[in-house]
Design a protein with these regions (language model features):
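Positively charged n-region of N-terminal signal peptides that target proteins for export
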Residues: 1-5
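Generic detector of short alpha-helix boundary/capping microenvironments
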Residues: 8-9, 33, 48, 65, ...
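Acidic, Ser/Thr/Pro-rich low-complexity intrinsically disordered segments
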Residues: 22-23, 51-136, 142-144
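Generic detection of intrinsically disordered/low-complexity segments and helix-coil linkers/edges
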Residues: 13, 35, 40, 47, ...
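Bacterial N-terminal signal peptides
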Residues: 6-16
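Predominantly extracellular/luminal regions of secreted and cell-surface proteins
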Residues: 21-46
Length: 144
């Protein structure tokens, strides 16, 4: 229950992050890192969604992004971060705040989570700074 509350409390951060001012150079660098990672999934037939989410993430804070997903599709959520981030993670939660089982790629300042929902609906993607200092990040997701 505590996880559910912290997830939904972070929605404000996600909204602020999503509708921020024009991107800084570090956010552009984070987007490049995320695009490089997402490109690997494109080689497996995944198509990148238009748009991305970027902003700044601090240690022990979450960036939370609400997404609508459809059953029958497969998704990969790719995240890139800039220095001084040392390790970043990405997780997927259902609408009740329950952590879902995903495939993971962990590459230090890049991470990805793969997921195939059994039900269509709203899900939440959490980006967490595990190690390092406050950093720019970018989330891109792909589907097939």
């Amino acid at each position: 229950m505590k996880t559910s509350m912290s997830i939904f409390a972070a929605i404000g951060l996600a909204i602020t992050t999503t509708f921020a001012a024009p991107e800084s150079d570090t956010e552009v660098a984070a987007r490049k890192a995320a695009l490089d990672l997402a490109g690997a999934f494109s080689n497996e037939g995944f198509k990148m969604r238009d748009g991305h989410w970027s902003g700044t993430i601090k240690p022990k804070e979450h960036a939370l992004i609400a997404v609508n997903l459809y059953s029958g599709n497969q998704y990969w959520f790719s995240v890139g971060a800039t220095e001084p981030a040392k390790k970043i993670s990405v997780n997927v939660y259902d609408e009740t705040g329950r952590l879902l089982r995903t495939e993971h790629y962990d590459g230090g300042d890049r991470a990805a989570a793969g997921f195939s929902p059994t039900d269509s609906g709203q899900y939440f993607v959490s980006v967490d700074l595990v190690q390092g200092g406050s950093s720019s990040f970018c989330l891109i997701y792909s589907y097939k």
